Design a protein with these regions (language model features):
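Alpha-helix N-cap/helix-start positions at coil->helix boundaries
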Residues: 16-21, 36, 51-54, 89-91, ...
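Structural signature of alpha-helical solenoid repeat scaffolds
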Residues: 28-31, 47, 61-65, 101-102, ...
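Long amphipathic alpha-helical scaffold regions
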Residues: 53-67, 125, 129, 137, ...
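Extended alpha-helical scaffolding segments
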Residues: 122-159, 169-170
Length: 170
């Protein structure tokens, strides 16, 4: 058993009743290792609703900020998009919307953020997070089209129009 396997085993052996702090302690050791199995394991944790919210948010931030291969970036972006539409907590959805700002070049991310920003029944915090992640994409054709749709929104329209003006598109 190598170090990655050992740490994954330790994490799993702690079980569902282990505190978030105990799980985070193991994750900190695991994250130091450069091994593709680490990303795979973190993705499993991110998608596991039985994990404590603190663990899932920590994993999300690690995946957002950590070194990823091109293939891993696509996989992580897909997992983050799933969190936007699932029954996850508002905080996790908010963190996913913000994290997707790092993945705007990946197919499917901009439409997912646009749909969320345009959804009037969602929380304004979540919609604004999606908008700021869209803004990070810069003035691409797809992003500009989404922002034009959003520019008439009662809550976000003013901020959107300001971005379009700053980009010299309105």
């Amino acid at each position: 058993m190598d170090e990655v396997e050992r740490l994954i085993w330790v994490f799993s052996a702690r079980g569902a009743m282990a505190s978030a702090a105990a799980k985070l302690d193991v994750l900190l050791d695991l994250e130091r290792l450069r091994d593709p199995r680490v990303v795979f394991f973190l993705l499993q944790l991110l998608g596991d609703p039985s994990q404590p919210a603190e663990v899932r948010v920590h994993v999300l931030k690690r995946l957002r900020n950590g070194p990823l291969t091109a293939d891993d970036r696509v996989t992580v972006a897909g997992a983050l998009r799933q969190l936007l539409s699932s029954g996850s907590s508002l905080d996790l959805r908010l963190q996913a919307a913000l994290a997707l700002g790092e993945f705007t070049e990946i197919t499917g991310v901009l439409p997912a953020l646009g749909a969320l920003a345009l959804e009037p029944r969602e929380s304004i915090d979540l919609r604004y997070a999606a908008f700021t992640s869209l803004e990070r994409a810069g003035p691409t054709t797809e992003c500009v089209n989404l922002l034009h749709q959003l520019s008439n929104d009662d809550m976000l329209g003013c901020a959107v129009r300001s971005v379009l003006v700053r980009w010299r598109l309105d």
